[in-house]
Amino acid sequence: MVMTDPIADLLTRVRNANSVRHEVVEVPSSSVKKAIVNILLQEGYLKGVEEYNDGVVPMMRLTLKYGANNERVITGLKRISKPGLRVYCKKDEVPRVLNGLGIALISTSKGLVVDREARKLGLGGEVICYVW
């Protein structure tokens, strides 16, 4: 089956696993998904990532992170730029998620970066998603 938006599929799998408090979620791997997952890991939204090859499709096993009383670290995930409606921002219009409590992932000429880094580097680009 052909997937029209693999990034939305990744975000939906993480959102669904998080909502039912699963410890682990498995997603098909790609270079863009690896970049997104690495940023989520660096920002403290995921506990761990393991890559493996399941024969046909390379996969990633994501370990979700929860707080002390089993509260969710990821409160929300929202896909912004979609295949049918791309959303771009200029360097002066980089979005701020929940007044800095969340992050916006932006695809720039320097690769995938977080909104803080895009502001610091003076870069605009395609707004991939919000995480809070």
UniProtKB/Swiss-Prot annotation:
GO biological process: translation
A Gene Ontology molecular function term of the record: rRNA binding
CC per GO annotation: ribonucleoprotein complex; ribosome
Keywords: Ribonucleoprotein, Ribosomal protein, RNA-binding, rRNA-binding
PROSITE patterns: RIBOSOMAL_S8
Secretion signal, residue range per the UniProt entry: none
Family label: Belongs to the universal ribosomal protein uS8 family.
Subunit structure: Part of the 30S ribosomal subunit. Contacts proteins S5 and S12.
Function recorded in the entry: One of the primary rRNA binding proteins, it binds directly to 16S rRNA central domain where it helps coordinate assembly of the platform of the 30S subunit.
Protein name: Small ribosomal subunit protein uS8
Upper classification of the organism: Bacteria, Bacillati, Bacillota, Clostridia, Eubacteriales
